[in-house]
A protein has these predicted regions:
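Basic, flexible Lys/Arg- and Gly-enriched helix-loop patches that mediate nucleic-acid binding at interfaces
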Residues: 1-257
Length: 257
C-alpha cells in the first residue's frame, strides 16, 4: 500500500503540493470512487486515476517513438536553439525523468527509445556496447561498389575511426534540378537531372553526425535520414511521425540482453 498523494507525485507527473490540490478538487478516483484524503492508502492493484486518466504505476517506463523532423533529442541543446525537444511529446504521460536513449540529429527521423530508466540508457549507449543502428538515407549523388567497399573498410575521422559498416544501395532516382527562371527571349532548355540514391546503412557506433560524415567521405550529401532499427528493436511503421507507444514485453526483453 502507498499514500495517494505519493502515488500521484510518482506516477502522475505532479508535485506533492499539486497532488493535494487535485485531491481536494475531487479530480482523483480510486477504483471509480472520488477520494480526497492525501493519506489514503491505495492497494497495489487499485486503479488510481487523475482527471479521468488511469495512472500506470510502474517505476520505469519504456517508449518507442517515431521521431519527427525538427525536434532535438539532446539533453543539452545548442545555445540559442529554441527547437522543441522530443520529451515535449510525452507531456501527457505524467512521467518524471524521461530522456532519449542516445540522440538523433534535429532533421533525422525514426526510431528513438525514450525512458526514465537510467541504467538501460547507459547500457545501450556505453562506448563499448556498439549497438547496431540501421538507417535509410537519401543522398544526393550516385553510390557504387567502391562506396560499399569504403563503408566496409571504415573511415578515419579526426576524433575516431569508424568500425566497418554495411552499405546497401536500394534505388537510384533521377529528379529535375531546380534552376533559375529563363529570360523571355531565351530558348527553353531541357531540365537538368540530379541523381539521388536511396541506401540502407548499418553502423556500430553513434558519433555526432556520423552517418552524414561517412557519406561525405564518398562524395555524397545526405538530404534525408531515418533510423529504422537499433539492435533487435525495429521501428513500428504504423506510428506516424511524433507518435509513440510503450515497448512490448518481448521488445524490452530483447534490448535488455
Amino acid at each position: 500500500m502507498e499514500r495517494l498523494d505519493k502515488i500521484l507525485s510518482n506516477f502522475g507527473g505532479i508535485s506533492r503540493t499539486e497532488a493535494k490540490l487535485a485531491l481536494k478538487a475531487g479530480r482523483v478516483k480510486v477504483d471509480g470512487t472520488v477520494v480526497k484524503d492525501p493519506a489514503f492508502k491505495a492497494e497495489d492493484n487499485d486503479e488510481v486515476s487523475l482527471d479521468g486518466k488511469v495512472l500506470v504505476r510502474q517505476k520505469y517506463r519504456y517508449f518507442l517513438l517515431n521521431k519527427p523532423a525538427g525536434y532535438i533529442s539532446s539533453t543539452e541543446p545548442e545555445p540559442g536553439d529554441t527547437s522543441p525537444n522530443v520529451i515535449s511529446l510525452f507531456k501527457n504521460e505524467g512521467v518524471k525523468g524521461l530522456f532519449p536513449v542516445g540522440r538523433l540529429d534535429k532533421d533525422t527521423t525514426g526510431l528513438l527509445i525514450v525512458t526514465n530508466d537510467g541504467e538501460l540508457g547507459h547500457r545501450l549507449t556505453a562506448p563499448g556496447k556498439h549497438v547496431d543502428k540501421t538507417y535509410i538515407a537519401k543522398v544526393r549523388g550516385e553510390l557504387n561498389e567502391s562506396a560499399i567497399e569504403a563503408f566496409a573498410e571504415g573511415f578515419e575521422f579526426k576524433e575516431f575511426t569508424s568500425a566497418p559498416a554495411k552499405l546497401e544501395i536500394l534505388e537510384v532516382q533521377q529528379q529535375a534540378a531546380i534552376t533559375a527562371p529563363e529570360a523571355a527571349d531565351q530558348e527553353p532548355m531541357p531540365p537538368a537531372q540530379v541523381s539521388f540514391t536511396m541506401a540502407k546503412v548499418t553502423i556500430h557506433e553513434g558519433k555526432f553526425h556520423q552517418v552524414k560524415r561517412m557519406f561525405q567521405k564518398v562524395g555524397c550529401e545526405v538530404v534525408e535520414l531515418k533510423r529504422i532499427s537499433m539492435g533487435a528493436l525495429n521501428l513500428d511503421e504504423t506510428l506516424k511521425p511524433g507518435e509513440y507507444r510503450e515497448l512490448k514485453p518481448e521488445e524490452l526483453k530483447n534490448i535488455m540482453l
